[in-house]
């Protein structure tokens, strides 16, 4: 589906994507989509994702949400929908990023807060939220590794005279430009050494493959909230 008034409405989805015709016509009624689908994949906006979560709850149709920029209130809507339908929610459907998050958590647990953690991310200039959902998820993974609240250690607003870096904080820096599909680097700093963990997306196709894997997983699951870690097993 697309928003009402979009020039894509009525077009074949395959042709609109630059592929061969597949017989799937783009519409603007999400409810009709849910009634005809086994699984719905949603990469849209926070407001649209919440509306789709409500429809998943009403219809019992599995839903994969890869939208970023959701507030805690938005996430609560998804959690509620997960009581009635299988719902996979993740900031990034890439298999590589999912594994990176697991590694970051393990490294953070081993090193402790005497090592400074900084996360740098880069995306295309059309991206509207910052830091990216993936960067924040990596920060949460690091905080989990240290067994601390992410909200207490997140530092993403540096500007001007900020004072000395607070021990234990997890810092963020953002770059926007060109057509970058997504790059994320988590760096652990000590006084005499540095560890860098990086993931670079060469194509958005990796997100599509991961989303399809998540959809296949969700279609065979009972109602509940799931993550890409669950999908990978």
Predicted regions and their residues:
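C-terminal substrate-binding/catalytic lobe of Rossmann-fold NAD(P)-dependent oxidoreductases
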Residues: 1-34, 113-233
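Hydrophobic/basic alpha-helical segments enriched in Actinobacteria
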Residues: 25-29, 60, 84
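An anion/phosphate-binding loop that grips the pyrophosphate of nucleotide cofactors and donors
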Residues: 37
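N-terminal Rossmann-like NAD(P) cofactor-binding module of classical short-chain dehydrogenase/reductase
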Residues: 40-41
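Conserved NAD(P)H cofactor-binding loop of Rossmann-fold oxidoreductase domains
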Residues: 44
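Rossmann-fold NAD(P)-binding glycine/threonine-rich loop
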Residues: 47-59, 65-90, 95-108
């Amino acid at each position: 589906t697309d928003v009402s008034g979009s020039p894509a409405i009525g077009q074949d989805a395959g042709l609109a994507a630059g592929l061969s015709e597949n017989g799937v016509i783009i519409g603007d009624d999400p409810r009709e989509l849910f009634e005809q689908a086994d699984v719905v994949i949603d990469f849209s906006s926070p407001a649209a994702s919440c509306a789709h979560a409500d429809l998943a709850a009403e219809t019992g149709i599995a839903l994969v949400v890869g939208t970023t920029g959701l507030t805690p209130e938005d996430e609560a809507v998804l959690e509620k929908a997960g009581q009635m339908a299988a719902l996979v929610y993740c900031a990034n459907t890439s298999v590589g990023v999912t594994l990176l998050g697991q590694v970051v958590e393990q490294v953070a647990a081993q090193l402790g807060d005497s090592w400074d953690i900084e996360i740098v991310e880069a995306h295309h200039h059309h991206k509207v939220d910052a830091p990216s959902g993936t960067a924040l998820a990596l920060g949460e993974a690091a905080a989990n590794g240290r067994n601390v609240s992410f909200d207490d250690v997140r530092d993403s607003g540096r500007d001007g005279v900020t004072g000395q870096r607070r021990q234990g904080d997890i810092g963020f820096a953002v770059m926007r430009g060109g057509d970058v599909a997504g790059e994320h680097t988590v760096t652990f700093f000590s006084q005499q050494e540095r560890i860098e963990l990086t993931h670079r997306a060469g194509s958005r196709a990796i997100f599509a493959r991961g989303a399809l894997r998540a959809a296949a997983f969700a279609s065979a699951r009972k109602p509940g909230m799931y993550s890409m870690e669950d999908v990978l097993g």
